[in-house]
Every structure is written in C-alpha cells, then in structure tokens.
Amino acid sequence: VQKQMFVDLQPDEQIVYDYLLQKGKELMDTIALDCGFPIYVLSGMLLNMELKGVIRPLPGKLFEAI
C-alpha cells in the first residue's frame, strides 16, 4: 500500500500546515496565536489534519508536520 502523496486540505488547514512546515514543532497555543485561530477552532482543525496524516501530535501539546 502506497501512502497518498497529496491530501486535500481546507484553506485554513493549509495555513496551519505551511506554518508547521516552516516552524517545525510548535505548541498549540503558539499556533493559535500566530495563525489567528481560536483554540476551539484550531483543536478541531488539528484533529482533522492528524486523521488526514499530515501532522502528528507530540507530548506537551506540541504538533509537527509529517
């Protein structure tokens, strides 16, 4: 089974993904502040992105792009 090369991201998800590619590992609170999303919106977005396989959570509320 080959991993899907391209994943369709929503525009807001693409903003977060590009941010994580640039920053590497980052705290959820910092992502929310820098990208301008409320935490309650960002947490759902991060979950969707994790399920799509484009980011992964790390201990301590850190996230990174895969």
Where on the chain are the PLM-derived regions?
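Short beta-alpha connecting loops at secondary-structure transitions
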Residues: 1-2
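Short, cationic-aromatic polyanion-contact patches
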Residues: 5-12, 27, 57-66
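Short amphipathic alpha-helical interface segments
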Residues: 8-37
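Short amphipathic alpha-helical interaction segments
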Residues: 36-50
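Glycine-centered, phosphate/nucleic-acid-interacting loop/turn motifs that mediate DNA/RNA or nucleotide
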Residues: 53
